[in-house]
């Protein structure tokens, strides 16, 4: 079965069995009897330059898809195969993202076991999220290398991620726990930095936004369900079982993606086709465009592309800088709430550890409701516009949905902060979190799609830089969250003024999508990176 053949399992079977993938040479019009003979001299060849491969000025034979309907092109895979890959990416993202928040219910028990203060223990959350920031700088560019692809990055990094949970669970000091948490964040990051690219590999542009929503739900579900599952482990066993559970869930994901996740990278699939043709014909001139481009990069240029370009884009491009700061603030609020929720619901409402884990479900409910609305918006507004204009319309129109979403964030913060008091039922502040879920979901969807449309040639660097700054902002937030809420009060609404500070900052950010909508085209016209 072709699907299993393209998975890691299939490649391992092929490698250890000594098998070689066969190529339909007649279909590609390849001359196999003499590696030095020009293709045009093969009398029985059915080669068609315009349909398949072309010879460039250097005599290299550029390997491409066999027409628009080539069955090996991931965009032409059957629907069931695309749905399986989508599920794999979403489940992988869910499992890895859960690794951050699953830690929080055990903070108190870890503090008592290791005889340290609260802030040093919170570093276990901070360093994990900081790993999200560093990892994409390494793994995102590597996944674009045609010789590597995405599949191997997912599997190998997840194996390391799973192994890191063992010393984390067995560790008896922060000297062991903290480095392991940071490394786990680094090796868990490919799902977050490359998952969207995997979906873009298989879905047509007018369908891609729908399935990005499911991936986003996986990214939301992980940190939302993490505290609940972590709390269950702390109550039933101990804090160490948070990491054993994370290891078991991740191991299940590893089994699934090993057997049921084929490679989706167009560059890597074409590279393998070119490699098979080289082996079959003995002609070294079969190359892909991506293979040629990557071979022209020196190690220094590749390192610059990995480490320097993402930072340059985030700092020098006003569009990228402003949206990165905005997204970073919205992302930080989630991790601030990992401290605010226990303060409010334990101090005011006297919730148990398990009940504290349940309060995050409001965010998940809000996200699911927003997805339903967003699907209608896509179907009625964006997709018809995309089809009517053949994909060519001002990228700034993608930001329209972010206009109301920008107001939802401060509404949520003021609501949550000042309804969290003993005289108000506990469900009321949880309802307030629904506005955050809705606002953050719509902001993330619109802003990431806009960045991809505005910087198509450098989208990997833009997203890597965004992940670096966004995750760094979020990583720092738990360190000052408890002090901010405890020191501002007041006693009858313990997260009131802290939430107000965040709400005011969110209000200051509201004009950003409006300004980019108005001036974005002019800013892009002055940029050497944007289109």
UniProtKB/Swiss-Prot annotation:
It is a multi-pass membrane protein. Glycans are attached at residue 486. Pfam families: MFS_1. It comes from the Eukaryota. GO terms for biological process: xenobiotic detoxification by transmembrane export across the plasma membrane. GO terms for molecular function: fluconazole transmembrane transporter activity. Gene3D superfamilies: MFS general substrate transporter like domains (1.20.1250.20). PROSITE patterns: MFS. GO terms for cellular component: endoplasmic reticulum; plasma membrane. It is found in: Endoplasmic reticulum; Membrane. The chain crosses the membrane at residues 83-103, 119-139, 158-178, 182-202, 214-234, 241-261, 325-345, 358-378, 398-418, 424-444, 496-516. Its main location: endoplasmic reticulum. Keywords: Endoplasmic reticulum, Glycoprotein, Membrane, Transmembrane, Transmembrane helix, Transport. The keyword Lipoprotein does not apply. SUPFAM superfamilies: MFS general substrate transporter. Belongs to the major facilitator superfamily. CAR1 family. This is Transporter mfs1. The gene is mfs1.
